[in-house]
């Protein structure tokens, strides 16, 4: 049981020196303190008798040689026999009997039972000290060079990950470059189309048509004709300009310019349109209410909003100067014509 406990302590903490003194009380309680002391005293007495006989035989030799040999033999014999007693503590050298003689000047101390463990602790401490000094030196150099880099230690294995990633990047970089070039080329090819497809007029216009008629198929042109006819039926576009410009998309694009809008407004005024633009728009919405009963809710809301806004606009026109009335009429006519 005692041996198993000693073995467990040694396995759990092989560098602990306090384990040498922990089992003293257990051994004394197991064997008895008197028996242990008598046994140790008898052993030490026999060792001292052997040392005294050997010192008498070597008395004719020189004093220095005699001291060295006796010191060597005494330490060796005592250490050898005491190491057999596994549970004897280190401080038993104080129980040496008084009749024993020792020619050496140094006190007799038995060798410790855990020499390998103690040496391994010393080696471990020295290795850690060297590692700590090297890490501190690396940190000082990095701080001096203004490079905040964590010093590498032999216990860390995370420094292999960036190297591994960089190694993979060698094989992936060519494919990434090719994909990037392909994406750039595709963007360059699609950019003219997007620039052509963007409308060059106001976002509030009813038709966003392109100046180049070749970019649209015949089905798109037919749809545009149908949309144009629907706008004419609702009164949003005058039917006078339909036969001359029904299939010309460039004319639709030119209609949205300010100069063309002014020309159309002058042409409308010269043709004798006595009714105001607000009245024509209200009439067109009333016609749309009659023609499309399915959209009654939407049309009624629009008509009501127009009826509410018409007195306010008429009052504004009356309050302003008469010279500006013609300009306001022209601007309203140009906006409603589109």
From Swiss-Prot:
It comes from the Eukaryota. Belongs to the ISF1/MBR1 family. Could influence the NAM7/UPF1 function, possibly at the level of mRNA turnover. Participates in mitochondrial biogenesis. Coiled coil: none annotated. Keywords: Phosphoprotein. This is Increasing suppression factor 1. The keyword Transmembrane helix does not apply. Residues 307-316 have a biased composition (Polar residues). Residues 50-70, 267-306 have a biased composition (Low complexity). Residues 50-72, 267-322 are annotated as: Disordered. The modification Phosphoserine is found at residue 119. It comes from Saccharomyces cerevisiae (strain JAY291) (Baker's yeast). The keyword Cell inner membrane does not apply. The lineage of its organism: Eukaryota, Fungi, Dikarya, Ascomycota, Saccharomycotina. Pfam families: MBR1. Disulfide bonds: none annotated. InterPro entries: Mbr1.
